């Protein structure tokens, strides 16, 4: 097969984006990195977002870490997902930072979570630690939007979690709350505190939180589309 080339500007259509992603399928991260002059780190301990950055280069992504989607003109978000040898997700998937203040009037329809999950390009990548990072292969991409049932499930979880935040119960939220969507602390160190609402309506300082998709949600999603048993 002819060697793929990175997109030098953002893709103009979903078809172009998907076609480019399909070209990467089967290549190792080391091969893709070498083709664009990147050095593959030994592991992801200090470079947690490295795989995402590499694929953004190949796919012509535009957003960086800005709040809009990675492919803003198309309204598509890129999510890499580490999978085991059976194609099952190995970890939860970060969606966006959870807003802990200023939430009056926010609805599911206008929420950042729904905005980020409206249209997602999922790219599975081999993630088992026994495989050296440079030798991990990129899998077949999937362009996905939540169906009615998935949207309902995510909405219910989001509403439950946001109610707890608004009612000053952020410190009581655990990873077990929510069936498919969870909230967890998201901070590189325990000193990075942010404002939130306390139990009596007062301002408190707490760790920043992030919304994550649980593995049971992404596992069912991948299994349904790739017919994994």
Curated annotation (Swiss-Prot):
Pfam families listed in its UniProt record: MutH
Keywords annotated in UniProt: Cytoplasm, DNA damage, DNA repair, Endonuclease, Hydrolase, Nuclease
Mutagenesis or variant effect for residue 155 to C: In strain: ECOR 35
Subcellular location: Cytoplasm
Phenotype upon changing residue 28 to L: In TS7; temperature-sensitive
Known role: Sequence-specific endonuclease that cleaves unmethylated GATC sequences. It is involved in DNA mismatch repair.
Impact noted for substituting residue 60 to C: In strain: ECOR 13, ECOR 20, ECOR 26 and ECOR 70
MF GO annotations: DNA binding; endonuclease activity; T/G mismatch-specific endonuclease activity
Keyword Hydrolase: yes
GO biological processes: DNA modification; mismatch repair; regulation of DNA recombination
Organism: Escherichia coli (strain K12)
Protein family membership: Belongs to the MutH family.
Protein name per its UniProtKB record: DNA mismatch repair protein MutH
Gene Ontology CC: one annotated term: cytoplasm
Reported effect, residue 135 to K: In strain: ECOR 51, ECOR 52, ECOR 57, ECOR 59, ECOR 62 and ECOR 64
Cytoplasm listed as a keyword: yes
Superkingdom of the source species: Bacteria
Gene name of the record: mutH
């Amino acid at each position: 097969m002819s060697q793929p080339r990175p997109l030098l500007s953002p893709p103009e259509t979903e078809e172009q984006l998907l076609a480019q992603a399909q070209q990467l399928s089967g290549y190792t991260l080391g091969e893709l990195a070498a083709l664009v002059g990147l050095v593959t780190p030994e592991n992801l301990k200090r470079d947690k977002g490295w795989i995402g950055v590499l694929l953004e280069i190949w796919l012509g992504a535009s957003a960086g870490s800005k709040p809009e989607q990675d492919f803003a003109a198309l309204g598509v978000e890129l999510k890499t997902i580490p999978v085991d040898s059976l194609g099952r997700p190995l970890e939860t998937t970060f969606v966006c930072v959870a807003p802990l203040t200023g939430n009056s009037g926010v609805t599911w329809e206008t929420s950042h979570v729904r905005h980020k999950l409206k249209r997602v390009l999922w790219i599975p990548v081999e993630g088992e630690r026994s495989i050296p990072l440079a030798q991990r292969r990129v899998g077949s991409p999937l362009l996905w939007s939540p169906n009615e049932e998935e949207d309902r499930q995510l909405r219910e979880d989001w509403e439950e979690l946001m109610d707890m935040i608004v009612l000053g119960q952020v410190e009581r939220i655990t990873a077990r709350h929510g069936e498919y969507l969870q909230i967890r602390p998201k901070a590189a160190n325990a000193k990075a505190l942010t404002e939130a609402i306390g139990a009596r309506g007062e301002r408190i300082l707490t760790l920043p939180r992030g919304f994550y998709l649980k593995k049971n949600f992404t596992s069912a999603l991948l299994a349904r589309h790739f017919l994994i048993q």
